[in-house]
């Protein structure tokens, strides 16, 4: 990569980080102004268009980055699990770490999931689908259950995790710890339910084939 390309990438990065830093519990992406984001990144507003077509393109890049960040973290969690950690507890603590360290990235995913822009809703849905698919792959490998079961289990788990994540954004450390314990219990119940359901289906099939 040439010096000019490196500089361009660095400025693009600064714009993404500037936009993330301006999000908060009170401030959504829709309320950000191009001028403010450019000022925070240290560039002239007119220079913004060398990096992004418009503010929406910046927002879609942020959605992609948020989803990718979360998926990479969960892959790291699976590596920690491979070294002997508890699957559900390690995954939950990794997810809560993500929210603690990147609250605005998670806020963006939550808000735009049901926001007014169809492009944003589609982008968030795609990121969540990637997340579900990766979890279903892992469950299929670990639990030796058919894809239909692991996909249903993964979808239920991700729905509950995102709901708990939304709560975790606005509570203190002690409440977050309680939330984590509740989430671990709920995910274990789903995992056990999926396993017993699968066993029951297997027994039914065996019974019919006799």
UniProtKB/Swiss-Prot annotation:
<keyword id="KW-0678">Repressor</keyword>
<dbReference type="GO" id="GO:0003700">
    <property type="term" value="F:DNA-binding transcription factor activity"/>
</dbReference>
<dbReference type="InterPro" id="IPR054129">
    <property type="entry name" value="DesT_TetR_C"/>
</dbReference>
<dbReference type="InterPro" id="IPR023764">
    <property type="entry name" value="Tscrpt_reg_HTH_FabR"/>
</dbReference>
<keyword id="KW-0804">Transcription</keyword>
<keyword id="KW-0275">Fatty acid biosynthesis</keyword>
<feature type="domain" description="HTH tetR-type">
    <location>
        <begin position="10"/>
        <end position="70"/>
    </location>
</feature>
<keyword id="KW-0963">Cytoplasm</keyword>
<keyword id="KW-0444">Lipid biosynthesis</keyword>
<keyword id="KW-0238">DNA-binding</keyword>
<dbReference type="GO" id="GO:0005737">
    <property type="term" value="C:cytoplasm"/>
</dbReference>
<keyword id="KW-0805">Transcription regulation</keyword>
<dbReference type="Pfam" id="PF21943">
    <property type="entry name" value="TetR_C_46"/>
</dbReference>
<dbReference type="InterPro" id="IPR009057">
    <property type="entry name" value="Homeodomain-like_sf"/>
</dbReference>
<feature type="DNA-binding region" description="H-T-H motif">
    <location>
        <begin position="33"/>
        <end position="52"/>
    </location>
</feature>
<dbReference type="GO" id="GO:0003677">
    <property type="term" value="F:DNA binding"/>
</dbReference>
<keyword id="KW-0276">Fatty acid metabolism</keyword>
<protein>
    <recommendedName>
        <fullName>HTH-type transcriptional repressor FabR</fullName>
    </recommendedName>
</protein>
<dbReference type="InterPro" id="IPR050692">
    <property type="entry name" value="HTH_transcr_repressor_FabR"/>
</dbReference>
<keyword id="KW-0443">Lipid metabolism</keyword>
<dbReference type="InterPro" id="IPR001647">
    <property type="entry name" value="HTH_TetR"/>
</dbReference>
<comment type="subunit">
    <text>Homodimer.</text>
</comment>
<dbReference type="GO" id="GO:0045717">
    <property type="term" value="P:negative regulation of fatty acid biosynthetic process"/>
</dbReference>
<dbReference type="GO" id="GO:0006633">
    <property type="term" value="P:fatty acid biosynthetic process"/>
</dbReference>
<comment type="function">
    <text>Represses the transcription of fabB, involved in unsaturated fatty acid (UFA) biosynthesis. By controlling UFA production, FabR directly influences the physical properties of the membrane bilayer.</text>
</comment>
<dbReference type="Pfam" id="PF00440">
    <property type="entry name" value="TetR_N"/>
</dbReference>
